[in-house]
Regions:
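Conserved AdoMet/S-adenosylmethionine-binding subsite of the radical SAM
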Residues: 128-142, 151-298
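N-terminal pre-triad scaffold of radical SAM enzymes
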Residues: 37-40, 83-111
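Short cysteine/histidine-rich metal-coordination sites, predominantly Zn2+-binding motifs
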Residues: 121-129
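Iron-sulfur (Fe-S) cluster-binding segments and ferredoxin-like electron-carrier domains
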Residues: 110-122
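C-terminal accessory regions of radical SAM enzymes
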Residues: 31, 289-374
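Conserved, mostly hydrophobic/aromatic
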Residues: 44, 107, 264
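Flexible, acidic/Gly-rich N-terminal and inter-domain linker regions that tether
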Residues: 1-90, 371, 377, 382-385
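Mobile, glycine- and charge-enriched loop segments
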Residues: 109, 138, 219-244, 335-388
Length: 388
């Protein structure tokens, strides 16, 4: 048994553990563990500094989890977009491939509580329908292995999956969505990274949410992945009481770059059952992006997105930097709120075969796009541009 596997076995995971370690009332502990089971491995447990701190809040159950049962247990409609077991196909050229229901740590804000922790083991035979679907859909060029956490699989099982995917010619990119570099970095071993090298290009998306999670161990894990040729990106979830502070987020993003992890996404917390006490306002997220953009390296500025309820996918949000836009110019503000004007370039005259109506329709489409993502234009300006 490898060290990381022993640490999983030694995790806090029972009602007795919750009572003894954290002083949670036994009746509450039983209800919480029944609602969504607990797993806190010894490594991550050791990062807690005091009750209620950002590490504690992410892994120790809270009675507030039981106060929003009316919330959706599948807010992103992943199951509705699952054509075969273990596959979610939402975007045109990529698919999510759920390879296990196990994780090295059960995050209290998990959006897949309905699946995570299921004790049923997944076999290669059980994944056959998923592989067949991927083979048949030649538009899929990018597959994200998720779960649970794919790095909860043994090296041998993970390699079987990677080898099978590499036999499908149209699959160009394989991504591993894993929190292990952050919550159980002992999982990243020389043997694992040597195996991953055989199946490039492989990208890793991990999930650091707070600067305290960056330790010597997690830095080493990320370095090993990067040295093995696996670019590592980070997907942070914005959470009340964890990282809803611009200074904390800037510190995290800058420290991630130092350990060769590229900030990729900041997510608004999903509207998932048992996690609404983590949610912040959208304004808080925009404030954080304002605090990053221009004030630190562009490398440290991730995309801020909402994973839209109902399966709409990731929708980016930005502070409004466009103050005015028309056919002649665009008026912008920078990160210091200073105003600048950039002259527009006249469009080339369309070919004579393009009807006047089509020209107007195209211009109207441009106006709609810009005015729904930036500052609205005055109605007269909109009309003048569209009909010009």
């Amino acid at each position: 048994m490898e060290l990381w596997q022993q640490m999983i076995r030694d995790s806090v995971h029972t009602t007795d553990h919750l009572v003894d370690k954290f002083g949670i009332d036994r009746e509450e502990a039983e209800r919480l563990n029944e609602f969504f089971q607990v797993r806190i491995n010894p490594y991550y447990l050791g990062l807690i500094r005091e009750k209620g701190d950002p590490i504690y809040r992410q892994c120790v159950p809270d009675i507030q989890e039981l106060q929003d049962f009316d919330a959706n247990d599948d807010p992103l409609m992943e199951d509705a977009m699952s054509p075969v077991p273990n596959i979610t196909h939402r975007y045109p050229d990529r698919a999510l491939f759920l390879t296990t229901s196990q994780c090295g740590l059960y995050c209290r804000f998990c959006t897949r509580k309905r699946k995570v922790g299921n004790s049923e083991k997944i076999s290669m035979k059980g994944l056959e329908a998923a592989f067949n679907y991927l083979e048949q859909h030649t538009e899929i060029r990018d597959v994200i292995l998720s779960g649970g956490d794919p790095l909860m699989l043994t090296d041998a099982m993970l390699e079987k999956i990677l080898k099978r995917l590499r036999q499908i010619p149209h699959i160009e990119i394989i991504r591993l969505g894993s929190k292990m570099p952050c919550v159980l970095p002992q999982r990243i071993t020389p043997k694992l990274v040597e195996m991953l090298k055989r199946y490039h290009p492989i990208y890793v998306n991990t999930h650091f949410n707070h600067p305290w999670e960056i330790t010597e161990e997690s830095a080493k894990a990320c370095q090993m992945l990067a040295d093995a040729g696996c670019p590592v990106g980070n997907q942070m979830v914005l959470m009340k009481g964890v990282n809803d502070d611009p200074h904390v987020v800037r510190d995290l993003m800058q420290k991630l770059l130092k350990i060769r992890v590229r900030p990729y996404y900041i997510y608004m917390a999903d509207q998932t059952k048992g996690a609404n006490h983590f949610r912040t306002s959208i304004a808080k997220g925009l404030e954080i992006i304002e605090h990053l953009r221009g004030w630190t390296s562009g490398l440290a500025v991730p995309h801020f997105v909402i994973d839209a309820p109902g399966g709409g996918g990731k929708i980016p949000l930005l502070p409004n930097y466009v103050m005015h836009w028309d056919e002649e110019k665009i008026v912008l503000r920078n990160f210091r709120h200073k105003i600048y004007t950039y002259k527009n370039v006249a469009e080339e005259q369309p070919a004579t075969t393009v009807s006047r109506k089509k020209q107007i329709d195209r211009r109207r489409a441009i106006v709609r796009r810009l005015t729904t993502t930036t500052a609205p234009l005055p109605n007269k300006k909109v009309a003048a541009f569209a009909e010009a």
